[in-house]
Amino acid sequence: MESSLPQVAALDRSTLLKAFDETKTGVKGLIDAGITEIPSIFRAPPATLTSPKPPSSSDFSIPTIDLKGGGTDSITRRSLVEKIGDAAEKWGFFQVINHGIPMDVLEKMIDGIREFHEQDTEVKKGFYSRDPASKMVYSSNFDLFSSPAANWRDTLGCYTAPDPPRPEDLPATCGEMMIEYSKEVMKLGKLLFELLSEALGLNTNHLKDMDCTNSLLLLGHYYPPCPQPDLTLGLTKHSDNSFLTILLQDHIGGLQVLHDQYWVDVPPVPGALVVNVGDLLQLITNDKFISVEHRVLANVAGPRISVACFFSSYLMANPRVYGPIKEILSEENPPNYRDTTITEYAKFYRSKGFDGTSGLLYLKI
């Protein structure tokens, strides 16, 4: 009898997940319904909720880099290259200020994502889908049916480059802003990839010529206030499967980066953007730049809004093969990974979900 209990529990969980998904109202729908306790499908394994705090030291805050001028003169350029290379190598995360994207564009992007998630439920349901190939998708937890616990957030996402959605496919609340903001992020990304190329000792356009800047996936996240934030997470520990990610976050906070086995807070800085190295950049730089794990805490305050832009073609057809850059390999620095395509890696990454392990282990030699 006892041996059948796990099967019964799994069946019950599957039923609950299906029922939640079929509402098409996401986590916000639970809050709108007035819940005071989180459903069991959101209860995270206790081990994933641990929060070892770093020593009280400035050494445990991610670097902030001033991009003012974009390194147009040689002295400033060398300084920027050194700072960004150092941050990508030691932290995998950094914030940028004076990045060239106007404050009003940042604010309108945050407001647009909020308006989408808070609009009439029936309108929002029209965008609900679990098809990753869709041009425009609203859902809650892409790995809902495979993860140990669901995350406390809802997401609107679309590819905005190289082929943005048709105007008629965009949400009225934020569609135009998503396209405008993406264009600004693409310009910033081009500069960052140039600086990262130079930090590797390569030609300025090396990473661009590898098509690292060609595709952009934009995800607008909505983290509703949580009645029991100590029992769940806004986003489970994971690393990104991109080349580079640029994140816009509002004032609520909750993002943490794993550094030297400590969870380090990334406090919101007005006007700043958070940049992090993705798995694909770690792969092609042969571990020179690191893709580190990060997570988002649930919060009784909220909603928290963030907009993440991923430089990667993800599940879009892309036959190009990627492996460690040959120009940086040597006898002392042999390749650590086998070659792959973005599509192959993205499918593996999606199938494993946010299980707390690095997808790069799949490609290790």
UniProtKB/Swiss-Prot annotation:
GO terms for biological process: biosynthetic process. Its cofactor is Fe cation. PROSITE patterns: FE2OG_OXY. InterPro entries: DIOX_N, IPNS-like_FE2OG_OXY, IPNS-like_sf, Oxoglu/Fe-dep_dioxygenase_dom. Keywords: Iron, Metal-binding, Oxidoreductase. GO terms for molecular function: dioxygenase activity; metal ion binding. Fe cation binds at residues 238, 240, 294. Residues 212-313 form the Fe2OG dioxygenase domain. The keyword Nucleotide-binding does not apply. Signal peptide: none annotated. It holds the Pfam family 2OG-FeII_Oxy. Transmembrane segments: none annotated. Coiled coil: none annotated. PANTHER family: 1-AMINOCYCLOPROPANE-1-CARBOXYLATE OXIDASE HOMOLOG 1, OXIDOREDUCTASE, 2OG-FE II OXYGENASE FAMILY PROTEIN. Belongs to the iron/ascorbate-dependent oxidoreductase family. This is 1-aminocyclopropane-1-carboxylate oxidase homolog 1.
